[in-house]
């Protein structure tokens, strides 16, 4: 009946005491010569680019984001890549500041639910979109993300309060839940989706890091993230034949 798919202190210089001595002549020429022979350490040290606040945007839509009744899918928010063009990152880590999302949810009646001889019954259901932080991201042996059921226990929990199953709480935590209770009389219904989630504040900083093992793989996909990945879970529950399509734009503000 159910189906699931995936997708840097302060530096201090101590001054030495200067004692005046008579009868002693010093040759400063040698000292000046030594200064000239000293290597210019600053010029040989590679200065890293300054980290700046930037924003990266990602649109999640298409056939893979269409949910049939009683189904769910899991995906991730793509982080910036280590490139020269902005938005980018200049380190193997970034500070996650805030994520905003805005989009549309479209609920459609299934073809088999149409009644020819009378009015169609209402389609009722619950849609959930959950933003989750993965503290220690890594691809499992199956090569996929944890499913909705594996992370939250069962899709039916969307009717109440979602929580991460005890076995996975050390790795995952919920950052935001968007929930819409739907009652559809016509064939289609459009619902607005929007929200903002703070990832860092004055008391806590959320940093993400990357492996960046090879030049070609210095990107922001889940497989290259080693700390604090952002996952998104979508779920549509309904007893009637129907489908839910999502188009959601994510904007991630970060220091990188």
UniProtKB/Swiss-Prot annotation:
Protein's name in the database: Nuclear shuttle protein
Pfam families: Gemini_coat
Stretches the record annotates as Interaction with Arabidopsis thaliana NSI protein: 150-187
Family to which the UniProt record says this protein belongs: Belongs to the begomovirus nuclear shuttle protein family.
Subunit structure: Binds to single-stranded and double-stranded viral DNA. Interacts with the host nuclear shuttle interacting (NSI) protein. This interaction may allow NSP to recruit NSI monomers to the viral genome and thus regulate nuclear export of viral genome by NSP.
Localization annotation: Host nucleus; Host cytoplasm; Host cell membrane
Gene Ontology BP terms: DNA transport; transport of virus in host, cell to cell
One GO CC term on file: host cell nucleus
Main location (coarse class): host cell
Entry keywords, A to Z: DNA-binding, Host cell membrane, Host cytoplasm, Host membrane, Host nucleus, Host-virus interaction, Membrane, Transport, Viral movement protein
Motif (Nuclear localization signal): 81-96
Biased composition annotated in UniProt, kind: Polar residues: 1-16
Region described as Disordered: 1-46
Membrane topology of the entry: Peripheral membrane protein
Record motif Nuclear export signal, residues: 177-198
Task of the protein: Binds to the genomic viral ssDNA, shuttles it into and out of the cell nucleus. Begomoviruses use 2 proteins to transport their DNA from cell to cell. The nuclear shuttle protein (NSP) shuttles it between nucleus and cytoplasm and the movement protein (MP) probably transports the DNA-NSP complex to the cell periphery and facilitates movement across the cell wall.
Residues spanned by motif Bipartite nuclear localization signal: 21-42
GO molecular function: single-stranded DNA binding; structural molecule activity
Outcome of substituting residue 212 to A: Delayed nuclear targeting
InterPro entries in UniProt: Gemini_BR1, GV_A/BR1_coat
């Amino acid at each position: 009946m159910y189906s699931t798919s995936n997708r840097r202190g302060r530096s201090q210089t101590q001054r030495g005491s200067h004692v005046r001595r008579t009868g002693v002549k010093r040759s400063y020429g040698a000292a000046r010569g030594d200064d000239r022979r000293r290597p210019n350490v600053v010029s040989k040290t590679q200065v890293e680019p300054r980290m700046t606040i930037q924003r990266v945007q990602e649109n999640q839509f298409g056939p893979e984001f269409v949910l049939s009744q009683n189904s769910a899918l899991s995906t991730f928010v793509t982080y910036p890549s280590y490139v020269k063009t902005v938005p980018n990152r200049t380190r193997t880590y970034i500070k996650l500041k805030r994520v905003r999302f805005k989009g549309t949810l479209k609920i459609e009646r299934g073809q088999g639910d149409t009644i020819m001889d009378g009015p169609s019954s209402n389609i009722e259901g619950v849609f959930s979109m959950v933003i989750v932080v993965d503290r220690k991201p890594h691809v499992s042996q199956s090569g996929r993300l944890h499913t909705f059921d594996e992370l939250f226990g069962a899709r039916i929990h969307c009717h109440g309060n979602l929580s991460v199953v005890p076995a996975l709480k050390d790795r995952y935590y919920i950052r935001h839940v968007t929930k819409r209770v739907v009652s559809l009389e016509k064939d289609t219904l459009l619902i607005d989706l929007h929200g903002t989630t703070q990832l860092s504040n004055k008391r806590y900083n959320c940093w993400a890091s990357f492996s960046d093992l090879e030049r070609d793989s210095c990107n922001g996909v889940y497989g290259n993230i080693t700390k604090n990945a952002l996952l998104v879970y979508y779920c549509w529950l309904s007893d009637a034949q129907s489908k839910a399509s999502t188009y959601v734009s994510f904007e991630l503000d970060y220091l990188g």
